[in-house]
């Protein structure tokens, strides 16, 4: 109830101020099933924008620094966000992600780990592919285009969802390659070979 209220309230202003234009809504799975939102990260407003237009609640993985302020941290927690330590393999965050997906909910991740202005696929580790395969979840690549300036247009593209074959045992290097390919899909690149 709280999430829905905030979604509608903040969503109204986000759509109004940034004139959000959405493409590919037909690519969003209709069924209430396990799903990972995987997006590029340009601004702290990215999760707000995606959440404002997405029909289901998204449980965002967010940098732990945001939770240091008790007021902000409490608000984010109430919205379903949870902290991740980007400097190490955060097992607690991984376990939280697995629980969210096993409960047939939607997990939101920015695999680049921080806001970026230039693409560098080599920074993408195996995490998203590993979590997706372990939970047999679909991945929905999402691309945000534009600058967050008043009355400038922001465009959101929902790409076609993909799923990793859970029956195949991949090496860590292969999982990294898959994760990097998923980010290529986010940016609209055509993948000529696939491991999934």
What is each of the regions a protein language model found here?
Residues 1-19:
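N-terminal membrane-anchoring alpha-helices
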Residues 2-3, 15, 29-88:
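Catalytic core of membrane glycerolipid acyltransferases/transacylases, capturing the structured
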Residues 10, 78-84, 111-114:
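Short, basic, glycine/proline-bearing loop/turn elements
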Residues 21-23, 88-94:
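Glycine-rich, highly charged phosphate/nucleotide-binding loops
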Residues 24, 40, 62-63, 80, ...:
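A secondary-structure boundary/capping signal
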Residues 26, 89, 145:
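Residue-level "edge-of-site" marker
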Residues 26-30, 98-99:
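Short amphipathic alpha-helix with an adjacent loop that forms part of the alpha/beta core around
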Residues 94-196:
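Non-catalytic C-terminal accessory region of glycerolipid acyltransferases
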């Amino acid at each position: 109830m709280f999430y829905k209220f905030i979604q509608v309230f903040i969503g109204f202003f986000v759509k109004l101020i940034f004139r959000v234009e959405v493409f590919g809504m037909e690519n969003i799975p209709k069924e209430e099933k396990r799903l990972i939102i995987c997006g590029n990260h340009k601004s702290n407003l990215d999760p707000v924008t995606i959440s404002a237009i997405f029909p289901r609640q998204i449980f965002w993985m967010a940098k732990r620094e945001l939770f240091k302020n008790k007021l902000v941290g409490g608000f984010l927690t109430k919205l379903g966000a949870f902290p991740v330590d980007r400097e190490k393999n955060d097992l607690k965050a991984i376990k939280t992600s697995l629980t969210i997906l096993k409960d047939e909910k939607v997990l939101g991740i920015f695999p680049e780990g921080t806001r970026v202005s230039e693409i560098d696929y080599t920074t993408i580790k195996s995490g998203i592919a590993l979590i997706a395969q372990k939970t047999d979840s679909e991945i929905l690549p999402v691309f945000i285009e534009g600058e967050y300036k008043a009355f400038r247009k922001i465009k959101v593209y929902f790409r076609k969802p993909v799923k990793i074959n859970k029956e195949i045992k991949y090496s860590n290097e292969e999982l990294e390659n898959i994760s990097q390919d998923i980010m290529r899909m986010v940016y609209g690149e055509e993948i000529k070979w696939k491991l999934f």
